[in-house]
């Protein structure tokens, strides 16, 4: 089942977003801060992360870098109540899939999650293909010698 991790320090926001995602058929996990995010990522390995920018123990924009370093295949969407251009630009540079303002048309978030989920699946497929290609490279073949006829 496709899964999403929702990170927000406001329980009402987490509950609302979780319900929306569950109605779309996603399995949803929740975290309230950066520390619990890392635990949830390790436990559940979601494909998409929906993360608030302002968290009690850190910043979502910076958290994107950490998440993408540990889990490069997953996609991160940042949500903020007070969006600004510099944060948005930095979020994208850090590897975020998108940066959106809370309260924007809620009808936009469902297709955005769907696109992020598709990209995350594509990322996994590309990783598998790369690993398979590397396993057949000459560097991976060790200890083999030519048979002389």
Model region roles, listed by residue range:
Residues 2, 11-29:
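Two-component/phosphorelay signaling modules centered on CheY-like receiver
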Residues 8, 52, 80:
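Active-site residues of response regulator receiver
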Residues 14, 56, 80, 84:
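The feature encodes the CheY-like receiver
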Residues 33, 59-62:
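Acidic catalytic/metal-coordinating carboxylates
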Residues 39, 61-73, 90:
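Short amphipathic alpha-helix used as the core "switch/output" element in two-component signaling
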Residues 44-50, 55:
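Active-site beta3 strand of CheY-like receiver
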Residues 129-147:
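AAA+ ATPase active-site-proximal loops
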């Amino acid at each position: 089942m496709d899964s999403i991790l929702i990170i927000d320090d406001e329980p009402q926001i987490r509950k609302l977003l979780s319900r929306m995602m569950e109605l779309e058929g996603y399995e949803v996990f929740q975290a309230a801060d950066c520390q619990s995010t890392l635990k949830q990522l390790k436990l559940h390995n979601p494909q998409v992360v929906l993360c608030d920018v302002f968290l009690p123990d850190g910043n979502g924009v910076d958290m994107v870098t950490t998440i993408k370093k540990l889990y490069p295949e997953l996609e991160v969407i940042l949500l903020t109540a007070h969006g600004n251009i510099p944060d948005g630009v930095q979020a994208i540079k850090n590897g975020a899939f998108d940066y959106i303002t809370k309260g924007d048309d809620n009808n936009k978030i469902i297709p955005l999650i769907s696109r992020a989920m598709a990209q995350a699946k594509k990322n996994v497929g590309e990783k598998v293909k790369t690993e398979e290609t590397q396993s057949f490279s000459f560097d991976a073949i060790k200890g083999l010698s030519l048979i002389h006829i």
